[in-house]
């Protein structure tokens, strides 16, 4: 993990922690608090083109198939791209009610692109894909 900018690293970790706390609470509004207005999200079969589209999609999910779920995220690295941009890579998964662990086939690798705007770190883009493990 890049630790040469401890204040920025702490702020980015805070963005990700807040994001997952909102997930665990099933709160779509809080989920997108740290997303840029023009943020994009790409996941298998999904392409969201704004913070509002992300919020709507999560609200629908939290009201149905994601209800009561929790998310885990194991942050791997943060790499800075100049003063106001960073890429974070993590391994994440969704734990559904009654599960104690996320099954390996539901784990994903996630890429977070963050931009510092007006002194605050915001999610500019998010992408995940299945974490395929060699047999």
PLM regions: where:
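Basic/polar N-terminal segments that are highly enriched at the extreme N-terminus
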Residues: 1-10, 134-135
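A solvent-exposed, acidic/Ser-Thr-rich amphipathic alpha-helical stretch
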Residues: 6-15, 28-84, 90-91, 103-106
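Short helix-adjacent coil turns
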Residues: 19, 26-27
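Flexible loop/coil segments at beta-strand boundaries within sensory signal-transduction domains
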Residues: 81, 97-99, 116-120
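Generic short beta-strand segments
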Residues: 89-97
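A short, polar/proline- and glycine-enriched secondary-structure boundary/capping micro-motif
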Residues: 98-101, 133-135
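Short beta-strand edge/turn micro-motifs at domain boundaries
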Residues: 107-134
């Amino acid at each position: 993990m890049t630790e040469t900018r401890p204040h920025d690293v702490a702020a980015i970790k805070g963005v990700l922690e807040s994001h997952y706390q909102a997930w665990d609470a099933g709160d779509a509004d809080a989920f997108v608090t740290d997303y840029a207005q023009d943020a994009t999200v790409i996941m298998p079969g999904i392409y969201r083109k704004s913070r509002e589209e992300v919020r709507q999609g999560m609200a629908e999910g939290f009201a149905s198939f994601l209800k009561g779920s929790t998310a885990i995220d194991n942050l791997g690295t943060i790499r800075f791209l100049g003063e106001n941009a960073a890429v974070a890579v993590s391994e994440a998964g969704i734990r559904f009610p009654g599960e104690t662990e996320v099954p390996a086939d539901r784990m994903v690798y996630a890429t977070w692109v963050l931009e510092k705007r007006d002194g605050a770190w915001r999610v500019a883009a998010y992408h995940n894909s299945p974490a395929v493990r060699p047999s």
